[in-house]
Amino acid sequence: MTGINKNRRIAIACQGGGSHTAFTAGVLKTFLKQKEYSIVALSGASGGAICALLAWYGLLMRERDLGVELLDSFWKDNSASSMGEILLNDWMVWVAGLRSTMVMPEFSPYLYPSWAQDEVKRMLEKHVEFEKIEKLVQPSSPMLVVGAVDVLSGEFKVFKNAQVTADAILASAAVPTLFRAVQMGNGLYWDGLFSQNPPIRDLPDADPDEIWVVQIDPHRRKVEPKTVAEIQDRRNELAGNLSLNQEIYFIEKINELVNRKLLVGSKYKFINVRRIEMSRDLDYASKLDRSSSFIQELMAYGEEQAEDFLKTGTDHPRIQGQSPVLAGQRG
C-alpha cells in the first residue's frame, strides 16, 4: 500500500455528532502535524464546526501547532471535570439511554436558563479571538465554512471566513432538543445537522485536489437493528448522513455532466473525495457523554485512524470515486 500523495491541496469536511466529534479533533491534530499537505479549506456542522474552527484559526495565525493546542485545550475544558459536572454528565447520558427504550417526558430548552450555551460561547471566546479574524483573513488564507439552518424559513445558511463568529458556531451547534435557537440578524438558527452535515459543495471554491470527509455516523452496519434502542440508534445515524449524501450527490451530478462533456473549461477539475470514518459501535446517548476518559479515548482513536489514513490513503474508501467539480480560483 502507498500513502496519500504529498504536496497536495486538501479540503477537510467535519461531520457533526456531539461528543463523538472528539474523534474529529484527533483526526485534525494529526493532519495539522503533517506539514506536507496544504490545508486550503475546512468545513463543519455542530461539533464538527467547532473542531474545524479551532484548526482553521491555527492556520490563520500561521501556526499549525497552535491549532493542535487549541483542539486539545478546548476538549479538555469541555470535559466534565468537577464532581458536579461528572454527576450531571452521568445523569444526562443515563436519561438519554432510557429515552431510546421507553417513553419519557420531553422538556423545552426554553423552560430553563441557557447556561449550557453560554458556557460553550465562553469556551469558544477563550480559545479564539474572533475580533481578529476579519483582519487575519487574506485572499490566500484557507477557507472556513460552517452550516446552520433557518428555523422559520427552512433555508440552509452557510457562514464563511470572517462571517464565522461565536454566535455562528453556536447556531451550527444548536440541537433543538437541548439548546435554544440562535438569533443572528433577521435569522433564527438551529443545528447544522439539519442543513449541510457537513458543508461540501462550497469547498471546491478553494481549489483543492482532494476533499477528506471526517465522518462520525457510519454508513453501514453489519447486523440488523431489532431492539428499540438499536432501531433508534440506526435511525439517528441515517438521519445524520442524509445531508452528507446529498452533498456528495451534488458532486456526482457535476461528475456526470462533465463525463458527458456538457460542462467544459479549465475551471472544472477532478477532486478525489475520501472518507475517514469513525467505525466504533457507539450509541446515540454517548454523543452527550463529556466524561474525560471517553473524550480522550475518542481523540486518541481519531489520531490513530488519521495516521492509518495517511499511510494507506490510496486504498482508503472513497466516496463515489473520483468526482469532477467546479474549481475555485487560487488566492
Cite the ranges covered by each PLM segment.
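FAD-binding core of FAD-dependent oxidoreductases
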Residues: 49-51
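Catalytic nucleophile serine of serine hydrolases
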Residues: 46
